[in-house]
Amino acid sequence: MEALAKEIDVPFALAEGAEGLAKLTAACRKADTIAVIDTAGFDLRNGKARAAFSALAQIESVEAVGVVSATADAEETLETVGALSSLGAQRLVVTGVDLTARLGALVAAATSGTPLANITCSAYVAAGLETVTPLSLARALIGSCGDADAGSAQ
């Protein structure tokens, strides 16, 4: 994250523990700035990890966003999305859309009831996130994810 922040020229801060995170989010609210809180992935079967994610989602002005991989099994993705949603995830990011020929996980996430925020169509962090629109989702499903010219008149 620090390398990405440097690449896109935005400030980076590291919060140690819940108290540090609370202070950082309060400072961001006071300055009317957006903070991106990146956490390590976790096993949804781990009660302590589930409680930590849920607590994070309860912080004032925090929008918890779940991240799932397009390379996962569709049924597993649906279960994961359901669990993340029950813990407070309000939207989803689906990564690795460019890495799989089978897009069942993307379809499962898109039809789960939890809104898709973004997808990734590149292995490079600097390529950023693609906002999900009906057109971008259709392009991803037909295999031209991230191709700005796909479907355009020639």
Please identify what each model-predicted range represents.
Residues 110-154:
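NTP-binding/hydrolysis catalytic cores, primarily Walker-type P-loop NTPases
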Residues 5-52, 57, 69-70:
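Switch II (G3) loop of P-loop NTPases
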Residues 42-47, 60-77, 99-100:
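Conserved Switch II/interswitch segment of TRAFAC-class P-loop GTPases
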